[in-house]
A protein has these predicted regions:
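C-terminal lobe and pocket-closing loops
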Residues: 33-39, 55-60, 67-172
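Short, well-ordered loop/turn elements at secondary-structure boundaries
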Residues: 16-19, 41, 62
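Sec-exported extracytoplasmic/periplasmic mature domains
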Residues: 16, 20, 28, 35, ...
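Small-molecule pocket liners
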Residues: 44, 63-66
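Conserved N-terminal structural module of periplasmic/extracytoplasmic solute-binding proteins
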Residues: 75, 91, 95, 163-166, ...
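Extracytoplasmic/secreted envelope proteins and their assembly/folding machinery
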Residues: 12, 16, 27-30, 77-84, ...
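Extracytoplasmic ligand-binding clamshell segments of periplasmic binding protein
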Residues: 1-36, 47-49, 192
């Protein structure tokens, strides 16, 4: 596979079909290489981003937005929140939420998707214990193959939100650096980073600098 020609979807296709060995993603995307692209569930693992030269190690955090129509009634909004419990996604450990967790885990197991821990959004003990119990009951993978990722993202200070400013442009500049490094063993990393920094600074100046 040519890493310079891949995007979110085709990258997972390459990973799932044997055209690539590594992909940068998170635990919410494990269905892409497996269920969507046919990778054996036992051939997938997750690891944390490597630490930098000073030992600093970070992971990007984000989330999936749930939106309501501006015309939604209070009853409709309340029902939508209730549906989060039905899906097992709410920060509760009641019967409805646990049944949702179990249904999701059963569906994953049936369709060859890793049944693993969730991203540490909710930290109340009742929820975490209930979720861990469901994962243990429906597990279809060797958890050691995923533990290093979860150990990292659960460390205090590991999770960082996107940088303020035009983060997508920053990603584009860093993608140029990554692609150059993995396709040219003699790439001048410092020069590439300096160029990326200069280009990104120009973007910030043009978009945010006040006259």
């Amino acid at each position: 596979a040519d890493p310079t020609a891949e995007d979110w979807g085709t990258g997972f296709q390459q990973l799932g079909t044997g055209g690539a060995a590594m992909y940068i993603a998170a635990n919410d995307a494990v269905a892409q290489p497996t269920q969507t692209n046919g990778l054996d569930v036992k051939k997938l693992a997750l690891g944390a981003m490597p630490a930098g030269p000073n030992g600093d190690q970070y992971s990007l955090t984000g989330g999936t937005p749930y939106m309501f129509s501006k015309d939604a009634t209070p009853e409709q909004i309340s029902a939508a929140f209730d549906f989060l419990e039905v899906m097992g996604k709410a920060p509760e450990a009641n019967d409805t939420t646990i049944k949702g967790m179990e249904a999701d885990a059963a569906n994953r197991k049936q369709n060859g998707v890793p049944v693993i821990q969730t991203f540490p959004c909710w930290t109340n003990k009742e929820y975490v214990d209930a979720n861990n119990k469901v994962v243990e009951e429906y597990s279809n993978v060797d958890t050691a193959m995923f533990q290093q990722f979860f150990d990292a993202v659960n460390k205090e200070g590991n999770l960082h939100t996107e940088e303020p400013g035009d983060a997508q442009e920053m990603y584009a500049q860093l993608t140029n650096v990554l692609q150059a490094v993995i396709t040219n063993k003699d790439a001048d990393i410092q020069k590439l980073m300096d160029t990326a920094n200069s280009n990104y600074q120009k973007t910030l100046d043009s978009e945010f600098k006040k006259n």
